[in-house]
Amino acid sequence: MKGVDADTFKKELLKQSIDELGHAEKIARRMIQLGYVPPSTLEEILKFTTCGQLTMPENVTDYESFIEKILRAERCAIAKYNELIKKYRFKDQITYELFEDLLEDEVDDEETWESFLEQYRRRKI
């Protein structure tokens, strides 16, 4: 990623990447508590994801496209966590609360990237 806004985006991506690793650890820990073996490779993880793998735009200075891709990923995660919250609401209180917490983080991330997109579009005009 290069250009005027690269440093701002890099800092936020690093922060959110660390947060996402924390999400993965929490989910893996819960899976183990329930007697499951969590996926351990990227290939295995991608089999379970309904959101797919995020790819960056070919033009590394196309910030608008970059942010829009991140927003699609955040919105997919939000939709998935909402589904899981509904699924576990009356079945498993601990898993339900876990997904509620993760959903809150994803909504915060979405709001951050929406703000970046709005700021970027205003600067572009």
What are these regions (language model features)?
Residues 1-125:
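Iron-associated oxidoreductase/ferritin-like identity signal
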